């Protein structure tokens, strides 16, 4: 088989080659219709948009993204053209939860807030569940909003997003990015919700997906603090939004060594199930780097403010936590 692989996916070099497969490691901007034309499988990250422009007239039959989400992949196109889509749900949930914990605690300290906030969580999946547990363990009141889960599981204690805006000090977003469907999340937080939420000592965190928060609306609501890791129009982020942020980071909330190892392991094993590559027991090795107790979120904020045009470079060269 021929694999075209984003060269920034860690732990992969030599793994598939050891089983006799051809691997071409490319920068994200080098993955295009020409370079994927003869590939059987793509192994990518969110920087690669997989749609008809990339895939028409190609040999690709499998796309594996080493990320929890797949809104960068035209799933309908893939399904209608016999292309399997693989992702790594939950791979970096612990890392994102730790980022959110560090973000809220940094905000409380810098704003000299000495009481536990009421925390609202929008999207209670892998990450949101961990965030809820952390802050409940601290003794904080936690309100959860997740309409699909609420309906599917007949949950009675979940709230709608307006109730979170009315009652919470902190709202943190952990949804996928969806369009044109029931409970679509595109711009789920815009003027209406921000009007309700506005006030002193209010914090909104987006470590979910760019586009869940309407950044133009956020810029108009100046009395809310924003901690933004996921931005609209990445890597060409809104510089005004960055200036407006309490903390801004270059989409690295999920960047831990363990999270990256988990993602690589998950997609390799799923590809193995499809193609019987002899890698059913393979696991990516990783070595611990910085621990969360050492993590200085303000250092990541400074790096982005110093070089906002280097957004992708900051991501690609980021030293993994944990």
PLM-predicted stretches and their roles:
Residues 1-39:
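N-terminal glycine-/charge-rich "phosphate-binding" loop or analogous flexible N-terminal tail
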Residues 6, 40-111:
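Phosphate/diphosphate ligand-binding glycine-rich loop within oxidoreductases
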Residues 6-7, 89, 97, 115-136:
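Glycine-rich adenosine-cofactor-binding loop
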Residues 57-62, 81-84, 140, 199-203, ...:
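A short helix->loop->beta-strand "cap" motif at the edges of active sites that frequently abuts
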Residues 97-112, 137-140, 265-274:
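Oxidoreductase and adenylate-handling cofactor-binding alpha/beta cores
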């Amino acid at each position: 088989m021929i694999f075209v692989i984003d060269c920034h996916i860690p732990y992969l070099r030599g793994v598939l080659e050891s089983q006799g497969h051809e691997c071409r490691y490319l920068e994200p901007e080098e993955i295009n219709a020409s370079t994927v034309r003869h590939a059987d499988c793509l192994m990518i990250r969110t920087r690669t948009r997989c749609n008809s422009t990339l895939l028409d007239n190609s040999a690709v039959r499998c796309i594996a993204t080493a990320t929890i989400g797949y809104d960068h992949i035209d799933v309908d196109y893939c399904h209608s053209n016999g292309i399997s889509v693989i992702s790594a749900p939950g791979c970096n949930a612990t890392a994102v939860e730790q980022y959110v914990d560090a973000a809220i605690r940094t905000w409380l300290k810098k704003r000299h807030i000495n009481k536990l906030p009421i925390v609202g969580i929008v999207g209670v999946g892998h990450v949101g569940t961990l965030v809820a547990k952390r802050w409940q363990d601290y003794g904080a009141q936690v309100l959860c909003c997740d309409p699909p889960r609420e309906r599917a599981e007949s949950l009675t204690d979940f709230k709608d997003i307006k109730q979170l805006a009315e009652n919470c000090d902190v709202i943190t977003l952990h949804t996928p990015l969806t369009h044109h469907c029931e409970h679509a999340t595109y711009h789920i937080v815009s003027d209406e919700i921000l009007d309700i939420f506005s006030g002193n000592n209010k914090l909104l965190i987006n470590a979910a997906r760019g586009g869940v928060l309407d950044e133009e609306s956020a810029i108009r609501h100046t009395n809310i603090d924003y901690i933004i890791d996921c931005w609209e129009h990445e890597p060409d982020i809104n510089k005004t939004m960055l200036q407006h942020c309490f903390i801004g980071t270059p989409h690295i909330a999920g960047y831990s060594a363990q999270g990256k190892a988990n993602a690589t392991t998950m997609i390799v094993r799923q590809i193995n199930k499809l193609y019987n590559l002899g890698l059913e027991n393979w696991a990516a090795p990783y070595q611990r780097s910085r621990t969360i107790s050492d993590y200085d979120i303000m250092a990541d904020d400074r790096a982005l403010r110093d070089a906002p045009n280097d957004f992708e470079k900051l991501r690609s060269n980021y030293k993994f936590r944990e």
